[in-house]
A protein has these predicted regions:
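Noncatalytic, basic helical substrate-engagement surface that gates or grips nucleic-acid strands
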Residues: 1-80, 85-96, 100-105, 187-190, ...
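Non-catalytic nucleic-acid-binding/docking modules located in mid-to-C-terminal regions
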Residues: 3, 70-73, 102-241
Length: 241
């Protein structure tokens, strides 16, 4: 069972929330031109494709993981991405991440080991330390270590006390950290919201629809002609039609 999500357009509703959010303006036109072709190839391979416009591809995968993980027919859900925002989706060993670059599977214990907090605190962590890949600046002086130290104790940004003298954990430069957070707490909460993946994308497919039954010969032949690679047809081991 496979689903593939794409940012059909790179802008999303998050750009309306924050002007600095990623836009794709730095993506080379030659790369952008390949996006529609890749979507067509995925569909021709017989995969379920979710092309996102208002939401992001990450939201589609988070929604699918949330929707299908309780299904007793599902043994495990593997999100094939090393992106740290997906860590918030991990649940025990039932919903895990696959870092294909390092060929590593990250379960809930792995999230704690890698980021210092549980999955539920990942949006807070990114809200504090920022996420340059998504254009989230974070709060000055709040790096991963200090953010994880406080969130391991308090779980959420909202729960971090304003007075650093009342913190029950030690953090280097606590006074400065507190001053920066208190002067930008609203911004931190906005960044947290930006980093929170949506689990309510209106996906219409059922678990049965996600079952891979083979590539679609006609569709793939058309794409192969377009890109000038007939060899792709020879590499297909299973056809749906």
């Amino acid at each position: 069972h496979v689903g593939v999500a794409f940012d059909h357009v790179i802008r999303s509703y998050r750009n309306d929330m924050f002007d600095g959010y990623k836009t794709g303006d730095d993506v080379e036109p030659e790369i952008l031109a390949q996006f529609p072709i890749v979507e067509r190839v995925a569909a021709a391979l017989g995969l379920v494709v979710w092309p996102m416009v208002e939401f992001e591809a990450d939201d589609a995968l988070a929604t699918a993981a949330t929707r299908f993980s309780p299904d007793p027919r599902v043994d495990q859900i593997i999100i094939c991405s090393p992106d740290k925002d997906f860590a918030q989706c991990v649940r025990g060993q039932r919903v895990v991440l696959h870092d294909r670059i390092r060929d590593r599977v990250i379960d809930e214990e792995g999230v704690h080991e890698k980021w210092g907090v549980g999955p539920g605190s990942i949006p807070d962590l990114l809200g504090l330390m920022g996420d340059t890949a998504d254009g989230i600046p974070g709060i000055p002086r709040w790096g991963q270590k200090s953010s994880a130290t406080l969130l391991a104790e308090y779980q959420t940004i909202e729960s971090i006390p304003a007075d650093p003298d009342s913190w029950s954990v030690k953090a280097r430069g606590a006074k400065g950290l507190s001053e920066n957070l208190e002067s930008q707490r609203e911004a931190a909460l906005l960044y947290k919201e930006l980093a929170t993946l949506r689990c309510d994308v209106p996906l219409t497919e059922s678990i049965e629809d996600l079952e891979w039954r083979g590539a679609r010969r006609g569709l793939l032949a058309d794409v192969a002609d377009e890109i000038g690679d007939q060899g792709i047809l020879e590499r297909i081991e299973r056809w749906r039609d």
